């Protein structure tokens, strides 16, 4: 759904949407629990869009969201530009097609960037990883506990005593471990991963392990619960910036890796991956600029994990326009659909959503729908399995960069 009105708080917006039927461009939509999208005012729409809700009345960047299945809340972590870019988080409650928020809480009193978060379903904790720019840009993580509409935090813990940038985070639900993958600027930007163990309100880490001995950017992660493997997707700068993925196996507080596999033989300036538990496939979405294109078209590819190896189907273009690095994918487990939210550079950089269906090693798509008729960046998605809604967080450039839902 798009943000309604000229509320400056809509720049890093969270939205809920419902999808089915024909979707005209520029119309507000809602994302249904069945993974489809419908335009407001059409007869195919079964629910109306609720009113927008601002969660941060300031420039909001690096938003990352996750669903807390214990409290049935969505947690958004972000950098608050109105408060010295402090690391901040807020709890959202979905009701129908509306979302409301508690009071934002600071988890890091310093400039915080490259934020990612996940939910530890074993101990019912939210884990946020980030770059602490006020502490030499060290890689840092903190544990959050949701209570009602509030969230509290333990003490931040450094997991990498060097500057880190692009990163991904996921929860290994087989071994109840958190895995963080990142670019280690203290080691030539090598792709590195580390295993974290949550205990109470703290987190401890094993030793970091290099998975790519080259500059590694645009890192994302997901957990394949069918094979009990961690999948990391990234841009391999050392190999012509190709889109690459690798399979990780957690054992205790360590992680080991198979061989790297290329999924896109072209410049790949962003990745987001999710696990489709219906087909037992990983879906990687990304912008790419193969030699035949002049822009970074939106792509998706289906991946199959076998042991410590990963193979791919044929990449599919879901948006024939520049999607920059603003692609975010999540899996709707009710409808068994992959939902992708992205920046559509071919349509004034409007926030746009599209629904994909995996079949074998292929993925097919319906029609895209605009959820924000303004430039939208820092997009993040999460599936609320309690309300069966997809929540989209984004920065609404056309509305003062405020965080909104």
Which residues does each predicted region cover?
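Extracellular, repeat-based ectodomains that mediate carbohydrate processing or recognition
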Residues: 44-405
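Glycine-anchored, exposed beta-strand/edge motif detector
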Residues: 1-48, 61
